């Protein structure tokens, strides 16, 4: 994985990335991705969790708000099949994303937007089967 050590964490987005490989492996095992899964990742950051899930699933879409991180994600060879959407997840509707539903939702989200994301998920119950949300 390409680590962008020069990436400035953006306070307005509450950025904080998972970096502990052992923890990431545990999270991926808990998610237990299957070849039939359609995964929607909220805020993939530098792609650390993404890399551990993408090889095992049918399709994966990641919604990222930070244009600098999109560039980083696009440069990671192991993420070539990842469909990256530039935008705010709260402005998206799962049914309009380029992924088949039901989706499995994963994300390591900033504390300051936890409630809005949980309400966003509740409003779209028909389009997802489970969610694995870590709160920073």
Put a short name on every predicted segment.
Residues 1-135:
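Catalytic cores of RNA-modifying enzymes
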């Amino acid at each position: 994985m390409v680590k962008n050590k020069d990436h400035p964490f953006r306070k307005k987005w509450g950025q904080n990335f998972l970096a502990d490989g052992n923890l990431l492996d545990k999270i991926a095992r808990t998610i237990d991705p299957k070849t039939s899964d359609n995964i929607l990742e909220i805020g993939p950051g530098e792609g650390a969790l993404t890399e551990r899930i993408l090889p095992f699933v049918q399709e994966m879409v990641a919604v990222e708000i930070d244009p600098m991180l999109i560039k980083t994600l696009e440069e990671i060879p192991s993420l070539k099949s990842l469909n990256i959407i530039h935008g705010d997840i709260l402005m998206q509707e799962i049914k309009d994303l380029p992924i088949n539903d039901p989706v499995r939702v994963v994300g390591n989200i900033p504390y300051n937007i936890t409630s809005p994301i949980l309400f966003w998920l509740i409003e779209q119950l028909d389009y997802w089967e489970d969610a694995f949300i870590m709160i920073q």
